[in-house]
Amino acid sequence: MINTSGKNKIKTDTVLKNFWRDNARFADLFNAVLFNGDNVIKPEALEEADTDLSAILKIGSHTETLQKILDVVKKSAYGVDLVILGLENQQHIHFGMPLRLMVGDALGYLKEYEEIAKKNKEEGHWDSTEEFLSGFRREDRLHPMVTICVYYGEKVWDGPFSLTDMLSIPEKLKPIVNDYKMNLIQVRESEQLRFQNPDVQTVFDVSRNIFKKNYGRIEDIYREQEIDSELGLVIGTITESKELINHALERKGGRMNMCTALEELKNEGIQEGKIEGYIEASKGFGVARELVEEKIQETYGLNAEQAAAYMKKYW
């Protein structure tokens, strides 16, 4: 949740999910990540799919309930078959992310397996005892599931990229341990991605340059351009810029000038730098945390939530 003012409270997950639900944007992201920007996945072929992959696992006498809900899931007809495409939005580094995504994919396969087994049982068409016991006929096949994790954080991802990065493996066992490599995209390190959709290109380009403080580049590209206020809201949400979010909300449903918003962003950055310096200096001199929090609230006109967020970030 980003609390920008007394009246504006923005839920990050909701903003990002709404942005990616658009088929053209969703398809462009997957094409850029999986197919080097080639138009393989067609927006018109995408359908909404159930995001809830939760399941009940039964192992012997033990039963375990697992819950997994992806942010956005689409089904796509690829050739003559179907592909399930999942998207996970991540604001912070997560040191268990490969395992989380692997479990999500596995639950997706389990869900389809159980649906097929249920249908087979109802129809009762078995060619062998083995098919009956497994609930799965020899010719039955699951559809591939591809999940992408988009990391929106300002820090470079220094967590694991694959399951084996999370394991302590003796050298001799490494070649025989099954791995799971996640499809991770970092917004701040996304220059190599070839986007075709202008909305996706704008969000990644502006957010990346804000993270890297390349304000001059943003001014050069967007000086004469206005962007949709929805994109401004997404960019402000990704970069956690309260001024940019407020600027976008004031023009809801309209267009906004990025250069004007950029000036507000610079001013916000200057104020944050002052707050950071004050907090760190006060901590160095042994000033009580609660006194510092009260002081920045009073000096910079912050509400309690904003002051607490700065304290958490810089104390």
Language-model features: locations:
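Elongated, amphipathic alpha-helical interaction scaffolds
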Residues: 1-315
